[in-house]
Amino acid sequence: MQFWYSRTWITWLMLPLSFLFWLISTCRQFLFRKGIFASYRAPVPVIVVGNLSVGGNGKTPVVIWLVKQLQQKGLKVGVISRGYGSQSSVYPLLVTPDTDPIQGGDEPVLIAKRTQVPVCISANRQHAIELLLQHQPDCDLIISDDGLQHYRLQRDFEIVVLDVQRGFGNGFLLPAGPLRELPSRLNTVDLIICHGQASKYSDVEMTLVPHHAINLVTGESRLLSDFHRVSAIAGIGHPQRFFSMLENLSMQLIQTKAFQDHQTFEAAQFVDFDQTQPLLMTEKDAVKCLSFAQKNWWYVPVEAEIKGEKVRSFLAKFDEIRKTV
């Protein structure tokens, strides 16, 4: 929504609805906190990775990074997710690297591929956790991909990911603005990760680093410096970020196309692209294109680099968990 990032007449028209949204969400949070509304406590610690605003903020790379950090500590980790974009007829659903993204959702399938840990999806987070623990009874920790505002699920740790480039938009709550909660919510979380340069709100800065491109058909890996004139597509929360990354790598983008986040792809959507030039896409998009990929299609995986004393302090909390399992 373009008007979320400015203050137009549409913004002011919707402001009363934003006040109603704030009133309802604040009351719900209070009722959960006081125990008037029932909430679920998982038998193992839960880490929620979420954000304050609608749209892509870089949560998935953070989840993948966090899984790997905890695995290095010897912990067995599982992931749960709402599974946005999933069209499964059965929930909860155990997502594996081989699950069809139409059924499992693009982000859960990507997480399963990159981490090899069990991923369960359901709008009911309790049901997702119960299925996950049936599959992996010795799980030490569960990471919830998104769900910061899902107060029905009790949590032990909270991480918020902020996109510096878009910030808080016009600063208003839904539907006048992009915010699900007010920025004051940041005062209660355990770690704030800024996607992009640091801001006054962030504890640490995250950089998404691309190293190479992988061919969707052959699996060949190639240096990004080998690519010069390319086409590119992106079906993520902020497509321009991907296009800018490629341009910063000295690539000339001869054709680009931005799709909606969690877009379901079909071969017909790609017929207008020049088949003689490489077509680059995100890894999240690639998992949905494997069944009809062409030999000139490549995806660019990224690794989250998150450093700093506050990260070390946060991760040190899980050393004690390891000692008790």
From Swiss-Prot:
Principal EC category: transferase
InterPro entries named among the record's database cross-references: LpxK, P-loop_NTPase
Function per UniProt: Transfers the gamma-phosphate of ATP to the 4'-position of a tetraacyldisaccharide 1-phosphate intermediate (termed DS-1-P) to form tetraacyldisaccharide 1,4'-bis-phosphate (lipid IVA).
Annotated keywords: ATP-binding, Kinase, Lipid A biosynthesis, Lipid biosynthesis, Lipid metabolism, Nucleotide-binding, Transferase
UniProt-recorded name of the protein: Tetraacyldisaccharide 4'-kinase
Pfam families: LpxK
Matches recorded under PANTHER family: TETRAACYLDISACCHARIDE 4'-KINASE (PTHR42724), TETRAACYLDISACCHARIDE 4'-KINASE, MITOCHONDRIAL-RELATED (PTHR42724:SF1)
Residues in coiled coil: none
GO molecular function: ATP binding; tetraacyldisaccharide 4'-kinase activity
Top-level taxon of origin: Bacteria
Gene Ontology BP, a term: lipopolysaccharide core region biosynthetic process
Record-stated family: Belongs to the LpxK family.
Transmembrane segments: none
Keyword Cytoplasm in record: no
Organism: Pasteurella multocida (strain Pm70)
EC code(s) of this entry: 2.7.1.130
Catalytic activities: a lipid A disaccharide + ATP = a lipid IVA + ADP + H(+)
HAMAP family documented for this protein: LpxK (MF_00409)
Gene Ontology CC annotations of this record: plasma membrane
Pathway assigned to this chain's UniProt record: Glycolipid biosynthesis; lipid IV(A) biosynthesis; lipid IV(A) from (3R)-3-hydroxytetradecanoyl-[acyl-carrier-protein] and UDP-N-acetyl-alpha-D-glucosamine: step 6/6
Residues that hold ATP according to the record: S53, V54, G55, G56, N57, G58, K59, T60
